[in-house]
Amino acid sequence: MSVDAATVRRIAHLARIAVTDDEVPHLQGELNAMLAFVEQLSEVDVDGVEPMTSVTPMQMKKRADVVNDGEIADQVVANAPATEDHFFLVPKVVE
């Protein structure tokens, strides 16, 4: 798969990132390099390899799975520009 300049501009638009025309070729190369690396990963033979969560064998410390509201909802939303009933209000982005 190859990314063209139009795709770079579309990705930037969807991500709400301002990209100049001078930056498009560089970003196009970066995205193509990332996709090429992912394609290489799909070719790796992983038969017989067990999934792992860490490169070092260690036991993870476990804690009780207890629902907790944190009791700081007012502090969490204190700096938000708009809130309602301890929820953040954000502009609609999907029509």
Curated annotation (Swiss-Prot):
Keyword field contains Ligase: yes
Fetch the InterPro entries from UniProt.
Answer: Asp/Glu-ADT_sf_sub_c, GatC
Give the EC number: 6.3.5.-
Enzyme class, UniProt record, top EC level: ligase
Enumerate the SUPFAM superfamilies for this protein: Glu-tRNAGln amidotransferase C subunit (SSF141000)
Membrane-crossing residue ranges in chain numbering: none
Q: What does this protein do?
A: Allows the formation of correctly charged Asn-tRNA(Asn) or Gln-tRNA(Gln) through the transamidation of misacylated Asp-tRNA(Asn) or Glu-tRNA(Gln) in organisms which lack either or both of asparaginyl-tRNA or glutaminyl-tRNA synthetases. The reaction takes place in the presence of glutamine and ATP through an activated phospho-Asp-tRNA(Asn) or phospho-Glu-tRNA(Gln).
Q: Which UniProt keywords apply?
A: ATP-binding, Ligase, Nucleotide-binding, Protein biosynthesis
What interactions and quaternary structure are annotated? Heterotrimer of A, B and C subunits.
Protein's GO biological process: glutaminyl-tRNAGln biosynthesis via transamidation; regulation of translational fidelity; translation
Catalytic reaction list: L-glutamyl-tRNA(Gln) + L-glutamine + ATP + H2O = L-glutaminyl-tRNA(Gln) + L-glutamate + ADP + phosphate + H(+); L-aspartyl-tRNA(Asn) + L-glutamine + ATP + H2O = L-asparaginyl-tRNA(Asn) + L-glutamate + ADP + phosphate + 2 H(+)
Q: This protein is called what?
A: Aspartyl/glutamyl-tRNA(Asn/Gln) amidotransferase subunit C
* Family of this protein: Belongs to the GatC family.
Please provide, alphabetically and separated by semicolons, the GO molecular function terms listed in this UniProt record: asparaginyl-tRNA synthase (glutamine-hydrolyzing) activity; ATP binding; glutaminyl-tRNA synthase (glutamine-hydrolyzing) activity
The record's NCBIfam families line, in alphabetical order, gives: gatC
